[in-house]
Amino acid sequence: MKSFPNKSLVALAIASMSSGVLAHGYVSESNDGVAASRAALCKYPTSDTNERNTNCGAIQYEPQSVEGPDGFPETGPRDGKIASAETALAAALDEQTADRWVKRPIKSGTQTFEWTFTANHVTRDWKYYITKPNWNPNASLSRDSFDLNPFCVVDGNMVQPPKQMSHQCNVPEREGYHVILAVWDVGDTAASFYNVIDVKFDGDDPVIPEWTQGGQIIPTMNLKVGDSVYTRVFDQSGENVAYRTELAISNDVLTQAKNWSYALASKINQEQTKLQAGQYSEDKFTPVYGTNPIYLQSNSGLERVEIGYNIETPVPDYSLTVDGLASEYIIGTEPTALDLTLTAEGDLTAELTVYNHHREPLASWTGSIQDGASEQVELTLSKSEPGHHMLVTRIKDTDGNLVDQQTLDFHLKSEEVTPPPSGEYDFVFPEGLSSYTAGTKVLASDGAIYQCKPFPYSGYCVQWSESATQFEPATGSHWEMAWDKLN
């Protein structure tokens, strides 16, 4: 049983599965990393300022999944699609303006970049690029935006990295806002992971005499008419309600997150003298339609500011339970079908899509399920090939807003067949791997016999390990480069 419970604005949790997962990873700052990626900051707030990217779309639930074609800069994602790697669930990451994304402070010189891997496949290399000194931060990211000579290259040696690792890189000198592009080239697929990192170099922040930042207004969600949002101001003794500023959401315009953020910052500046909100410029604080820092007067005795909400209509709890998904399916003569039972808590719309390892959609289903009801769903795959597959489940509320999504993994396996007589082959793959040469015949996992190709392709026949299977006969992504199928 797979259950997706909602708490507050829904945090999905699923029962663990024994099946494998696809290679995934992202640039993080959980330990010693200097800056997290744009996608990671959609899900995880910064540890020092609690800032987080907003309106990211589905990638906020899967920051590890910004995967696209490899070969950058010669090939790879198209200009304008570099930040998303042309992945649909990351499309929002391609938005590019000077004030769209949270920026992390950085200095030129030696810096630590940290990667977190949810599946640590063999690696060809990591490369780091940075935007040119004269780049345009209000134009879509393109190859012309970047210095295409990587400032840091780390050899992966075609081995599996640990689940978390760091790279020491010498960051070039820059001023102000720049974007770093970190590319992880996976060694056993034709894909790479693209992580853009928004950074701000020292020397660009204004010195604000007698003021220190104590919090910020982050437009995390839209509100409804009748709700309110307010500041919670703390001094050494605890919360001091005398400095509280509250904004009532009294019309449809204010329901939009960027609008109430601007309005609350403006109201703080009108009502308070020891607090001010907005961007500092020319000796004044100017509210913006986005994230607004909140500053405290240095001698005020105030320590920090948090944001609170009065929600007139409680956010409903949603959950979706998925029963019937097996970890493995045997491929037979009929198309493979997944027989599932979906059970909902709360009125919701469920969207299910099955993908193979190469992210080709093979089956889909969409339907509304009422609170407490169950729905029987059969997903018949358009093709059945051995290997890793994914069931992606999306939950939407009654307004059509994406609540959350989750990926469940399963495998298809070839039907057991009677192997041919042993005299017709030299080895059962991968036995005797080091002795494979041109003409060597092996019995593969699909029950068929494969023969190692002549030179110069015969060298691929011995390139195999449990974590690097691209040349494995029958199932490897590039097996036809190494082998000829004989029966």
From Swiss-Prot:
Gene: gbpA
Signal is among the record's keywords: yes
Single annotated GO MF: chitin binding
Annotated Chitin-binding type-3 domain residues: 438-479
Homology family: Belongs to the GbpA family.
Protein name, as recorded: GlcNAc-binding protein A
Start and end residues of each Chitin-binding type-4 domain: 24-201
Span list, region Disordered: 61-80
UniProt-listed NCBIfam families: PRK13211.1 (NF009690)
Role of this protein: Probably interacts with GlcNAc residues. May promote attachment to both epithelial cell surfaces and chitin.
Stored Gene3D superfamilies: 2.60.40.2550, 3.30.70.2150, chitin-binding protein cbp21
Pfam families, A to Z: GbpA_2, GbpA_D3, LPMO_10
Lineage: superkingdom: Bacteria
Record keywords: Chitin-binding, Secreted, Signal
Subcellular location: Secreted
A GO CC term assigned to this protein in UniProt: extracellular region
Matches recorded under InterPro entries: Cellulose/chitin-bd_N, GbpA_2, GbpA_D3, GlcNAc-bd_A, GlcNAc_Chitin_IntDeg, Ig_E-set
Signal peptide: 1-23
Major localisation: secreted
